[in-house]
């Protein structure tokens, strides 16, 4: 679950940046779907860091990072490979302040 102080802004961000579809939207609770994944947005909060970050995987994490910035998100740690890990990993904050990991599997 992600927190949102502005539900319309939060729903728009995840729809336009990542292609999530709306299952339901209200001021205080919204559900979005992408493939088999569903995320919930809880409204009425000031946003902020979620204790367990959501991780989204992409075929092109660098393009995803560009979409994040274009839509008002902030890159905290640009996508890069960490030593010994088979992924590119980046961290950003959405416009509501939630911390999200973005990854791309690159093999061994």
Residue ranges and their predicted role:
Residues 17-22, 72-74:
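Conserved acetyl-CoA-binding loop of GNAT-fold acetyltransferases
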Residues 1-11, 38, 52-54, 104-108:
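N-terminal beta-strand motif that seeds the catalytic metal site of vicinal oxygen chelate
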Residues 10-15, 68, 97:
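Conserved active-site tyrosine of GNAT-family acetyltransferases
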Residues 5-6, 23, 59, 83:
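Residue-level recognition of alpha-helix initiation/capping sites
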Residues 9-10, 27-30, 85, 108:
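Short glycine/proline-centered loop/turn elements that form peptide/ligand docking sites
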Residues 21-52, 99-105:
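Conserved short beta-strand elements that form part of the metal-binding/catalytic scaffold
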Residues 1-5, 33, 46-108:
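Vicinal oxygen chelate
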């Amino acid at each position: 679950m992600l927190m949102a102080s502005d539900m319309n802004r939060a729903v728009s961000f995840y729809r336009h940046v990542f292609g999530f579809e709306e299952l339901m939207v209200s001021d205080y609770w919204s559900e979005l779907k992408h493939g088999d994944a569903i995320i919930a947005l809880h409204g009425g909060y000031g946003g902020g860091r979620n204790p367990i970050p959501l991780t989204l995987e992409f075929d092109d994490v660098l393009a995803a990072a560009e979409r994040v910035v274009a839509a008002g998100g902030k890159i905290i740690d640009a996508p890069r490979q960490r030593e010994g890990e088979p992924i590119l990993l980046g961290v950003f904050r959405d416009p509501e302040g939630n911390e999200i990991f973005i990854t791309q599997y690159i093999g061994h």
